[in-house]
Amino acid sequence: HAMDPEAAREVRLAGCNNLYLSFDGVTARTNPKNHWEIPYALDSCRKTGTTVVFVPTVIKSINDHELGGIIRYAQKNMDVVHAVNFQPVSLTGRMGKGEREKYRITVPDCIQRIEEQTNGEVTVDDWFPVPSCMPLTNVIEAFSSKPKYELSIHFACGAGTYIFEDAETKKFVPLTKFCDIQGMLELFEDKAEEIRSGKNKYFTMLEVVRKLKGFVDTKKQPAGLDLAKMFGNILMKRSFDSVGSWHVKGLFLGMMHFQDKYNEDLERLQRCDIHYLTPDLRIVPF
């Protein structure tokens, strides 16, 4: 199907606008399952307007030396690849301690390797735990008076960051390099509380939008990007299209560590945000 543009068109017409695509490395050795098919698949998605998320399973000693290469390949295809979601391997079945230690890799391990393999363009300090986005959800929820999907998962479940390509240097510039994320999140949380306590939500949101520029260092902001305007559109329009404008300019890097019987954490399971619904109507954490 990767080499069949008609198949891609049928998938798109059926309503699919984004594909999660397994992509474990940039060589045939690390990614034997679809190394040769990937360029054709991306070309088919490009022609049909379907966006792609690369999903590499990361295994220590197997492909952990190619994390930077995966990000660079995504960079070359940013018109269609909008995210890379790394998944440190889940070790299933019977496995001795030595074998586990050979293959086990954690979220912090991956983040450290990414810093090394991107020559410091994406550092360990550029990442945030997933629930950090809750203040943004809270202020949108307060303004719209409608419940929104909350990523209130356990802090150790995963991490993420946004990186942008400087139009002139072609180097990555992480969001944290030119935006005071901590200050912005505190503003969102404070204004959400003001709206909930009865303050006029329209005046409050206008104040939020007005203050956004103060959190952005325009001198360090990548050429061709207006982050404050982009954030304002997301807050005021609250639509998928406004979020899409963000992705066109940037690349999301995510990390989710799936659990196995050797590192199972009940607190993480209880706070999972993604679930399977079984035929007998049980809800099982992803």
Protein language model regions, located:
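Radical SAM/AdoMet-radical enzyme domain recognition
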Residues: 1-88
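Short secondary-structure transition/capping segments
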Residues: 9-15, 41-45, 96-109, 129-142, ...
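Short linear motifs at secondary-structure transitions and domain/linker junctions
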Residues: 58-62, 134-140, 247-253, 259-262
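A structural signal for short, well-ordered beta-strand segments and their strand-loop junctions
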Residues: 53, 83-86, 123, 277, ...
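Alpha-helix-loop-beta-strand connector modules within alpha/beta enzyme cores
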Residues: 41-51, 110-118, 122
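Radical SAM enzyme core and accessory elements
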Residues: 148-286
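Short C-terminal domain-edge/linker segments immediately following a structured domain
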Residues: 26-28, 85-88, 115-120, 192-197, ...
